[in-house]
Regions:
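N-terminal export/targeting signals for secretion/compartment entry
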Residues: 1-77
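Intrinsically disordered, low-complexity prosegments and terminal tails associated
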Residues: 47, 52-311
Length: 311
């Protein structure tokens, strides 16, 4: 429980003008209406032959597709846990090296009477002690509806995010999450309970939060085991991320805020490839069902010699 409490408190500890607090607030802005206590910080194979067939499919649906959303994702997530367990653990980082990660992202933000989807690139460099550095580059905003764009123009075309921003990152508390599936389930369930949205949807978000950063095979396997036990997680099926990489997707629907959260994995390695938030009928923004309000594609992970170096 202490680890997830730390996970929630992480944003408040980040120094600098562009810190993890702001980054996490951006990720969760689409759901802040019902998540007041955590606005700043929150969130495959039915049978083996089915998975093999899915991977071979040439035409993959996008992860934002609505799909049938009827089959349980539990068998597939259990398979992902098995795949993770046999992955070779990465050698520990040594002094003078950093774990580099790059994400292609889009976050919903806005003002009075308008919202914009802001595309950008986030990069991080993580040192052996878990601390690091975050750099963000933001492109021109896009707008979910013409009314949003009109509202933005009427407001004087305010700058949503600066073109570039950066800040320090403290050590991630995810490094200390338990790898025993039962213990991890209890930890995540206790942290998710009573945080505005449904407990099941919040648990799904917390699992995704922990999968975003590189995790040991043991932790990744435990996270998939936990996800397999969350009620209502649906099998989406074959999918492609925004870079065109093929994988398999699962989803959780938060009925309180009418939002669908999709995760897409590489079934060969169990790595998280990307995620996407889409609105459903009855959402608080009154957007058409299927409107994308957030996404992240995990593009690059590598070891580099110093902060600022890119592979």
């Amino acid at each position: 429980m202490a680890e997830l409490d730390l996970l929630r408190s992480l944003p408040a500890t980040v120094a600098g003008p562009s810190d993890e607090a702001r980054a996490r607030a951006r990720e969760r802005l689409a759901r802040h209406i019902e998540r007041a206590p955590s606005t700043r910080r929150r969130r495959l194979l039915i049978l083996a032959v089915v998975l093999a067939a899915a991977v071979a499919v040439a035409a993959f649906a996008s992860i934002g597709g609505r799909g049938t959303g009827r089959a349980s994702a539990a068998p597939l997530l259990q398979r992902m846990a098995s795949v993770a367990r046999v992955q070779k653990a990465q050698q520990p980082l040594t002094a003078g090296h950093f774990e580099y990660s790059k994400w292609i992202v889009g976050y919903l933000s806005g003002g009075d009477g308008w919202y914009a989807l802001n595309p950008g690139v986030r990069e991080s460099w993580i040192a052996p002690n878990g601390s690091g550095f975050l750099h963000e580059r933001w492109n021109k905003p896009t707008f979910p509806t013409a009314a949003d764009k009109a509202g933005w123009i009427a407001a004087g075309r305010p700058q949503v995010y600066p073109p570039e921003d950066s800040g320090k990152l403290p050590p991630s508390p995810r490094r200390h999450l338990p790898t025993d599936p039962d213990e991890l389930y209890t930890t995540i369930h206790d942290a998710a309970a009573g945080h505005g949205n449904s407990t099941d949807a919040e648990m799904f978000t917390l699992v995704a939060d922990a999968l975003r950063d590189p995790a040991s095979p043991a932790l990744r396997a435990a996270l998939y085991d936990v996800a397999a036990r969350i009620p209502g997680v649906e099998l989406v099926g074959p999918a492609a991320d925004r870079l065109g990489r093929h994988g398999v997707a699962v989803a959780s629907v938060d009925g309180k805020i009418h939002e669908r959260h999709v995760l897409i994995f590489d079934p060969r390695t169990s790595a998280l490839l990307g995620e996407e938030y889409t609105q459903l009928d009855g959402n608080p923004y009154h957007y058409p069902a299927g409107t994308v309000t957030g996404y992240a594609t995990y593009a690059v992970s590598a070891i580099v010699d110093r902060i600022g170096i890119r592979p």
